[in-house]
Amino acid sequence: YGFSQYSMPLSPPLFDGRVMASQPDRGDVVVFRKPREEDVDYIKRLVGLPGDRIQVVDGVLSINGKPVEREKVEDFVAEDGTPVPRFRETLPNGVSYMTLDLSPNSAGDNTREFVVPEGHYFMMGDNRDNSLDSRFDVGYVPFENLVGKAQVIFFSVEGDVSPLEIWKWPTDLRPGRILTWLG
């Protein structure tokens, strides 16, 4: 999406806006700075473009009044053996991905309708019931807060474990996710 002051984290703000800007696509997994808390990086899927009407009804994402195609697939099995319902969602532009439904009546399963303002985007996590995203306090994400498109999971550990806590790696490292390319 080009470069912004957030693209170069260790440099002082050299310019306003974006250089060599391009627009993100619906379905992109995006790294962005959280609005109003710009020292916090988030990574979520872009589901709403400027002008879109976004709503979740009974756990089903709706874009501009049309429910997104959602197909039940094989359950995800949590580490404790608990089966978690998993769905394949397909956005109107054909981008497809898996989502988890940890609880059938979570806070984000029924929302008001959101109308995405110009120059902003609506983001949601794929783990819908465990995601602070645009349905909640993240809100609409301005274009200038986008850092870039996520392309690979470089490193992955469980929960809130810091990658620097190497003594926890034997129990908390998730080797199956390391170097996973994001579609």
What are these language model-derived features?
Residues 1-183:
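Soluble "head" domains of membrane/secretory-pathway proteins
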